[in-house]
Each structure stands twice: as C-alpha cells, then as structure tokens.
Amino acid sequence: MRLGTVEHKKERKVIVLVKNDTFLDVAQAAAQAGMSDFDFSDMQRLIEQGENALEKISFLLDQGNENCFISSDEVVFCPPLIPLQYRAFSIFEEHLKNAFAQATKLSGIKYEIPPVWYEQPIYYKGNRLSFVGHQAEIKWPSFSEFLDLELEIAAIIGKKGRDIQEEDASDYIFGYSI
C-alpha cells in the first residue's frame, strides 16, 4: 500500500495510490463509507490508529469509490508526514568518510570516524520541518556555496517500544519513505 500526503484544492489530504497516476482521497472515502470512528485527516493521526486504520484503507480501496479519486496532475505532493521527531542515523561508512573528507577540505581540521561509530548506532536530531514533497523545488540558501544532496530512506515507527528484540523490530515499523 502506497500512502502519501498531497495538497488538493488548497487542502492537505492523505491519499493512497490506486493505480499509476490515480489516488484515493482517504478521508473523503471514509466519510462517504460512514467511517466516523477513524481520523484520516493527516498521516500522523493515521499512523497512531495502527493496523486497524490500514485495514480500513484496504477496505476503502476495494470499494473503489471513483468520486473519491484524484488524478496526480491535480495535486502538489507534500512530505508524507511531518514527523514528531526526526533522528538521522549515519550508517554508511563510505558516506561518512566522504563527508569527513569534505569537512577536512573546507576547514583544514582533520576529521576521522570515531571508534564508537563502529560499536553503536550514531544519530543526530534534524529539523523535523525540513522535509519536502515529491518533485518539490529545493531552496538553495543564499549563504551556502554548495548543496549536499542525499537520498535518504526513512523507517517510520508505528508503535511504541523499548528494548525490542531484533527479530521483533519489523513489527514496530509502520512503513518506509524515500
């Protein structure tokens, strides 16, 4: 199931891909189906409702209510969700080596990967409002001499947990985004 968030007629909507360039407006379809017990107004609310919400969306897709369909040429893609928090993990050694080499080149200070990086996951907290939608224009800050463009993959956590066993980890992932 491919979910997203779009702006359609000046309103943000959660959508699900029906086929190729056609999406289902999830909230509109739910309202027409009388599903007042679910809130599909934004992706975060959908995630917080868990597996039951996904089952309801599958049901709505099966209904195929065409008056709730939206064409891709009618929308502006938004970030799939605005996360409550954002942690970026540095997990690719080659990327980190390249980043440190660039930092060394620009600053004259020698940067090396610290030994702890090989022992435990290292992350930084990013700006949760820095995400953009598919095909969005990336703003180049006037004070910057170059852009560091990266393709990121996000694992979106769907339920709370602590000290989760490796074999159970996938049960806590709602989905992925690029």
Annotate the PLM regions.
Residues 1-37:
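Low-complexity, small/basic-enriched stretches
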Residues 4-6, 11, 38-178:
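Active-site microenvironments in enzyme catalytic cores
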